């Protein structure tokens, strides 16, 4: 062949030389005849040129016996390869034979057919030998067939390299009817595998057996499995294996999943599922085709997750949330999210939040710490939402909705307790916090505030507590107070905080008034008394009715002078003194030294009486009541505070006729007062005492304390039962006005409206959650007042009356 190619090349070179010579001749003619062409020459057609290739030689004819001779050598080479022996001729020599035969299409076709027969014959004999020597042990069998497959592929690689020219010419030219040498080997191998004693079935079953052993914890030869799976894929029978593999996987995890879900706890089951998912993922990567992934994972999802979702959540969800098991909850979320069951988590999430929250609200023993407990509860849920549930939007909304639901199952109490909680943080006497810590607590409190529907209840109690903090100088920081007001304004608008802001303005204005008053000549006679007076706008403050009391002469004179001063500058205004919110700092002489006592005005009045009593002298309850003018319940509360074990400024003495049990009034009073007796100078637990009207009292001159400034337990800063009741009554009254105004406003616009529609609009309009029965009562009252009337034809329709 090379000889022929060289001849062609030489001929081509000669042709090129001839052409070049011709070109040179043409150039010479042109150079010699530079005259312009005449008309006769221009009209004569040019002579035809003939291309002549000199020294052209034909391909020599192959000898008659060349085909048989070449095939014998090629066949012998194939046999040597199949026998794992060296060939007598080099690969290059064998390749040349194939190349020479392929120049003739008939010889090429004959060559292809002979190769096909020899390949088929060898594979058939090999597979038959495998059947005769086949082991019943699946692993040994797999090793045997893998060895044959490896030999086959190695042999076919060598055979293909010899007959590569045949592949590139004859096979490509007849690709619709013949296979490549490599595909020919695969075809015969696959056919024999299927036809010989169901060898294909045994191969698939043995592979499934090995995979099952691995799933049960045994070690297997993964390279062996990978090789055989690749064999099935190459032979186009992987799909058959895949079908059986999925069936086997389904059976395996059906049984194992049912067993595990009943045997182990939910966290362990979730761990088991994750491990199985990882194992199957690794199995896919190591020896399975990626086309199997979707079906395989669908089986695991169905058998290990979807079928057991309800059991998983019922058995373990609450326990995992209670135990703050973030990692396990994260696994739960990932697994259920992968099968589209987030809604099931949402249902369990909502149920847990509501049930736990309602239990917390109903635990009366922990009412004092309820708000802090709720904040801790919310923090825990937020942590789960963030770290375990990836801040899923559906679960985030479910948390908000559930928290709002349970916190409003008790309409007024949570709102009151949130206000009380904020009061405890802004009031002197609580745990000291940095500005950052206080800001954090206030922000968290606002989260609960947002959930509360009865914001008017919060407003009422917050205003009550704020008034005491401002008037009794119990606020830790005015800046913190104003910051809280600003937060409330952002949440609810200016209307909500208008009166709260006015309270601060009253305090600031009062300071200016007092500075002016102290500089006036009217106070020259009162230099021994340092008094601070707050002038409050009655509409802005939660002012209770004044409590009657007989004040010392100095106090009355000071009040009278201030009255004249203020009214002289504010003509037409009147002042009403709120003595119940006043407090004093007294200097008291005891045997062990002087002390400063911080007490309420009413306690001051009581202590003043003992200035006129000789040492060791006593005053009866009735004497004190007559001289102070205080009502009996009020007097009992203040005496109890002065006699408590934390202060012991006064010593209580029981008469022989005193009852061991108190009346209802005394019991309520003592309970309230004993609860307020905190923060005094002396240590020890507060003893619950009862003040009887037959008791006598004497000044404790032996009182001792390491502190110079003594804060006598005062009931002023605490909300009394009466004040609490009054606040709730005011809330109810305000709500009635709001409902009436809303009804009139709606009906004035609509003129005519059905009962259900009116109720619906009221619920959406009001800031609190009213009961339908209460709304119905207000409608009836407005009908009586002739703001509304029933439609003559339908009693469930209301008409507005101008």
Swiss-Prot record:
Keywords: Isopeptide bond, Ubl conjugation, Ubl conjugation pathway. Pfam families: Cullin, Cullin_Nedd8. Residues 1-33, 656-676 have a biased composition (Low complexity). Residues 1-43, 656-686 are annotated as: Disordered. PROSITE patterns: CULLIN_1, CULLIN_2. The keyword Ubl conjugation applies. Neddylated. Deneddylated via its interaction with the COP9 signalosome (CSN) complex. InterPro entries: Cullin, Cullin_CS, Cullin_homology, Cullin_homology_sf, Cullin_N, Cullin_neddylation_domain, Cullin_repeat-like_dom_sf, WH-like_DNA-bd_sf. SMART domains: CULLIN, Cullin_Nedd8. There is a cross-link at residue 748 (Glycyl lysine isopeptide (Lys-Gly) (interchain with G-Cter in NEDD8)). Residues 734-794 form the Cullin neddylation domain. GO terms for molecular function: ubiquitin protein ligase binding. Belongs to the cullin family. Probable core component of cullin-based SCF-like E3 ubiquitin-protein ligase complexes which mediate the ubiquitination and subsequent proteasomal degradation of target proteins. The E3 ubiquitin-protein ligase activity of the complex is dependent on the neddylation of the cullin subunit. This is Cullin-4. The lineage of its organism: Eukaryota, Amoebozoa, Evosea, Eumycetozoa, Dictyostelia. The gene is culD.
């Amino acid at each position: 062949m090379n000889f022929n190619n060289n001849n062609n090349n030489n001929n081509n070179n000669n042709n090129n030389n001839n052409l070049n010579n011709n070109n040179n001749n043409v150039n010479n003619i042109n150079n010699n005849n530079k005259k312009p062409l005449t008309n006769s020459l221009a009209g004569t057609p040019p002579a035809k040129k003939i291309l002549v290739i000199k020294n052209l030689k034909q391909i020599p004819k192959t000898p008659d016996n060349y085909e048989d001779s070449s095939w014998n050598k090629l066949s012998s080479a194939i046999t040597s390869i199949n026998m794992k022996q060296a060939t007598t001729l080099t690969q290059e020599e064998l390749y040349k034979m194939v190349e020479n035969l392929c120049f003739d299409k008939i010889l090429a076709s004959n060559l292809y057919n002979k190769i096909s027969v020899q390949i088929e014959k060898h594979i058939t004999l090999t597979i038959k030998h495998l059947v005769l020597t086949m082991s019943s042990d699946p692993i040994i069998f797999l090793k045997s067939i893998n060895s044959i497959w490896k030999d086959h592929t190695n042999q076919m690689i060598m055979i293909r390299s010899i007959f590569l020219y045949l592949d590139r010419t004859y096979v490509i030219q007849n690709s619709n009817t013949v296979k490549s040498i490599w595909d020919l080997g695969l075809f015969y191998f696959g056919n024999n595998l299927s036809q010989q004693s169901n060898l294909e079935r045994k191969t698939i079953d043995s592979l499934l057996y090995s995979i099952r052993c691995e799933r049960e914890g045994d070690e297997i030869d993964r390279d062996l499995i990978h090789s055989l799976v690749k064999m099935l894929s190459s032979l186009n029978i992987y799909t058959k294996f895949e079908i059986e593999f999925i069936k086997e996987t389904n059976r395996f995890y059906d049984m194992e999943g049912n067993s595990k879900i009943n045997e182990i706890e939910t966290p362990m089951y979730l761990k088991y599922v994750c491990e199985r998912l990882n194992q199957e993922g690794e199995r896919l990567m190591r020896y399975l085709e990626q086309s199997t992934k979707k079906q395989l994972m669908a089986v695991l999802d169905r058998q290990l997750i979807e079928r057991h979702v309800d059991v998983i959540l019922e058995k373990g969800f609450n326990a995992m949330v209670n135990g703050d098991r973030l990692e396990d909850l994260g696994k739960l979320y990932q697994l259920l999210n992968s099968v589209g069951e987030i809604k099931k988590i949402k249902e369990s999430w909502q149920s847990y939040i509501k049930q736990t929250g309602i239990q917390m609200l109903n635990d009366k023993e922990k009412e004092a710490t309820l708000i802090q407990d709720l904040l801790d509860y919310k923090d825990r849920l937020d942590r789960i939402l963030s770290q375990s549930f990836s801040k899923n939007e559906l679960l985030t909304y479910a948390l908000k909705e559930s928290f709002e639901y349970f916190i409003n199952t008790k309409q007024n109490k949570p709102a009151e307790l949130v206000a009380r909680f904020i009061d405890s943080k802004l009031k002197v006497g609580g745990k000291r916090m940095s500005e950052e810590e206080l800001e954090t607590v206030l922000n968290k409190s606002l989260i609960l505030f947002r959930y509360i529907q009865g914001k008017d209840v919060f407003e009422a109690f917050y205003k009550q507590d704020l008034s005491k903090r401002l008037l009794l100088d119990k606020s830790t920081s005015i800046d913190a107070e104003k910051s809280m007001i600003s937060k409330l304004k952002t949440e609810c608008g200016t209307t909500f905080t208008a009166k709260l802001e006015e309270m601060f303005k009253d305090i600031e204005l009062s300071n200016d008034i007092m500075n002016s008053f102290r500089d006036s000549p009217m106070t020259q006679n009162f230099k021994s008394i340092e008094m601070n007076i707050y002038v409050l706008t009655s509409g802005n403050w939660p002012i209770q009715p004044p409590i009657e009391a007989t004040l010392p002469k100095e106090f009355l004179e000071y009040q009278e002078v201030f009255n004249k001063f203020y009214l002289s500058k504010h003509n037409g205004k009147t002042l009403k003194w709120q003595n119940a919110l006043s407090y004093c700092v007294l200097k008291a002489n005891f045997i062990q030294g002087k002390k400063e006592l911080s007490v309420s005005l009413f306690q001051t009045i009581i202590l003043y009486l003992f200035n006129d009593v000789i040492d060791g002298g006593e005053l009866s309850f009735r004497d004190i009541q007559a001289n102070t003018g205080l009502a009996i319940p009020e007097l009992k509360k203040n005496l109890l505070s002065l006699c408590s074990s934390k202060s012991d400024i006064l010593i209580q003495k029981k008469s022989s006729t005193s009852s061991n049990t108190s009346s209802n009034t005394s019991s309520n009073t003592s309970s309230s007062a004993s609860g307020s007796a905190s923060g005094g100078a002396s240590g020890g637990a507060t003893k619950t005492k009862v003040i009887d009207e037959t008791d006598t009292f004497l000044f404790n001159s032996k009182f001792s304390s390491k502190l110079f400034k003594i804060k006598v337990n005062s009931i002023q800063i605490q909300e009394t039962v009466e004040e609490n009741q009054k606040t709730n009554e005011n809330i109810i009254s305000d709500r009635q006005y709001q409902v009436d105004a809303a009804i009139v406003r709606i009906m004035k616009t609509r003129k005519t409206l059905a009962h259900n529609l009116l109720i619906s609009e009221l619920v959406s309009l009001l800031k609190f959650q009213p009961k339908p029965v209460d709304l119905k009562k207000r409608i009836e009252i407005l009908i009586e007042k002739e703001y509304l009337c029933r439609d003559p034809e339908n009693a469930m329709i209301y008409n507005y009356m101008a």
